Amino acid sequence: MARLSPLHLRVQCAIRERQLLRPGQRLLVAFSGGQDSFSLLQILRDLQPRWRWQIFVLHCDHRWSADETACAQFLQGWLQQQGLPHAVETADPIRWDEAGARAWRYQQLDKWARTWSCEAVATGHTASDRAETFLWNLLRGTGAAGLVSLDWQRRLDERDPTSAWLVRPLLGLSRWETEEFCRQYQLPVWPDRSNQDLAHGRNRLRLEVMPYLKQHFNPQLEAALNRAATLLQAEHELVVAQAAQLWLQVYEPALPGLRRDPLRAAPLALQRQVMFQFLSLLLPHHPTFEQVEAGIRLLKAGRRSRSPDYPGGGWLEVRGDCVVWVAASQPASFVP
């Protein structure tokens, strides 16, 4: 067995304490070729004899540039040389859209996790990523769910309880630690030149805004943002748990709709969480704050009041004691 470094032991401790992985599991590693995913793959491989995992690897080539395609070819050769079961997915040429690219990557991860019967998908996100995500979403005005979105584990597809678990074993490490680990183990990291392009807001946040905040406001900025995310995560989990109980009282699947009286009597935070969950069942993407608030306003509105149209053409409408979803193709029906 390979001798484990202090970094190996920290990751193994996180896996055990947070129950991220179990012995003997089949794991899919999301592998970009950068320092974080190389560190993740190396650490999991070194822990493999102790945990008896079966490790599979997926690399996604977005075809944004010739450099990225060259990276995919290099990594495929390296993975073959290492004898690791792997696949490389190549996207149709798409415009630079981080949200669209992320959705495509997660679709591929879900597909290959099912193909290889993997119970867990591991990504190389670090505490540095978590801090950036927290600040980025805060600047965009997102709610608690967005601020704590980069957590240790969740379902790969949050709408599908049969999907694999998405786990982030490196979330306790910083980016400089994975950089040093790759240097120590002489891992052939492929530098992603697109990460230096300041035309993209997330890059500017990482390269300019966060260093400025560290220098002038808090040298321990990453630790502070991670601490805030951890505290907020516990509060958000409480709201979600209480909203799940309220959901059983208000949801009318046959309509589909929500009963107004018990929902209106609940605290606003629970109203919003239930409305968010309801709209998430109906819309192609998670609802925005404005879309949730449009539903909340109907809890006190008169009968036949309705929301603006949602994506896809449907809307919410007050019918009797319920706020119901009306599909664009659904015929009108009289409800007193």
From Swiss-Prot:
| Enzyme class (EC, first level) | ligase
Task: Tell me which UniProt keywords the record has, alphabetically.
Answer: ATP-binding, Cytoplasm, Ligase, Nucleotide-binding, tRNA processing
**Gene Ontology cellular component list:** cytoplasm
Q: Where does the chain bind ATP?
A: S32, G33, G34, Q35, D36, S37
For this protein, the Enzyme Commission number is 6.3.4.19
Role of this protein:
Ligates lysine onto the cytidine present at position 34 of the AUA codon-specific tRNA(Ile) that contains the anticodon CAU, in an ATP-dependent manner. Cytidine is converted to lysidine, thus changing the amino acid specificity of the tRNA from methionine to isoleucine.
HAMAP family noted in UniProt:
tRNA_Ile_lys_synt
Can you say what this protein is called?
tRNA(Ile)-lysidine synthase
| Naturally occurring in which organism (per UniProt) | Synechococcus sp. (strain JA-3-3Ab) (Cyanobacteria bacterium Yellowstone A-Prime)
Gene (name only)? tilS
